[in-house]
Amino acid sequence: MIRLTISAAVAGIYLALSGAAFGADPVPLTVTGEVIDTFCYATAGARGEGHRTCGLACAEKGIPIALLENDTDKVYVLLPNKNAQPVPKGLVAKMGLQATVAGKSYRVGGSQFLTVDSFK
């Protein structure tokens, strides 16, 4: 019984450290939707052009932005396509407006992320 418990613990640690627990490889994806700030959307449902000024201020303070997909209402947290780089300012400037973002989609637990490889 002790061997089984130790084996299970070692396997769990291996999976956690190997990244296998994070799901499949990233998938290329293009999504069209509204650029939102995650705080105000999550806490108050704030979105649209009427929330644009506040959303821009939140993004400037470092609150992550996301893309609210048209038709499905899926929220993709937007990530830079290179480590330690910001999301492009031109995309942040589309706060409250429509944008199309192409990149790689990652799903971790119940969260969805999308790198910003290009946008329009």
Please provide the spans of the model-predicted regions.
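Positively charged n-region of N-terminal signal peptides that target proteins for export
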Residues: 1-6
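Bacterial N-terminal signal peptides
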Residues: 7-19
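OB-fold and OB-like single-stranded nucleic-acid-recognition modules
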Residues: 22-120
